[in-house]
Amino acid sequence: MIQLQRVSKQYDKGTIALRDINLFIDKGEFVYLIGPSGSGKSTLMKLLYREEMQNRGTIRVGDFNLNKLKERQVPHLRRTVGVVFQDFKLLPKLNVYENIAYALEVTGESGRTIKARVKEVLELVGLAHKAKSYPNQLSGGEQQRVAIARAIANRPAILIADEPTGNLDPETAMGIHRVLESIHRRGTTILMGTHNDTLVDHFQHRVVVLEGGRIVRDDRKGDYHESH
């Protein structure tokens, strides 16, 4: 599902973000990507949806070989990969329904499909009653639920979540993670970057640890928690 072979990333000013990364994530896995700030977590995730490109190595995401991906194919890749950010990135002048519908409109879905999909994902994240609310009328946790709903509206096979609970209080963070668990149970592969040890310890999925741009640990389900 996701495969990185000897992947390295260096920025123009000489900063090395990733060094010789080898990582395989199977279909249906839930994987935590953890490590200190500057360890390369966000860079690795950006490579997977072609926000950035590696300098060396091979990346495969689903059916896409990113080394051979043409610019016109990037939108097709991004329908396969949903992305959730720490800062929500909702459009302030659109209500909840419209924020999610917009993600479907740009891919050319029909009005009937859009209506059904928005209803489906709002029910999944527990916000069907907030469809007509605007972002400034929502709590931080509610805004993140909308962002998650938008990310899965196209039914992506993979969901990348970069610090999705970073700005939230512990109780709200736990609620957001339970939403991600529900999505995972539907068969979606999830890669989640986080600093939240409480969530990692509680839910016990596979843990990949980055330090200095290198993978220093890759613990299968339960192993990290037994040795942590």
Identify what each model region corresponds to.
Residues L94-A101:
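Short coil-to-helix segment of the ABC ATPase nucleotide-binding domain corresponding to the Q-loop/switch region
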Residues Y134-L138, E142:
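Conserved ABC ATPase signature
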Residues P170-T172:
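Helix N-cap at the start of a conserved alpha-helix in ABC-type nucleotide-binding domains
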Residues L159-D162:
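Catalytic Walker B motif of ABC-type/P-loop ATPase nucleotide-binding domains
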Residues Y49:
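Helix-to-loop junction immediately C-terminal to a conserved catalytic motif
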Residues A153-A157:
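A short, proline-enriched helix->beta-strand linker immediately N-terminal to the Walker B motif
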Residues G57-N65:
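Conserved ABC transporter NBD signature motif
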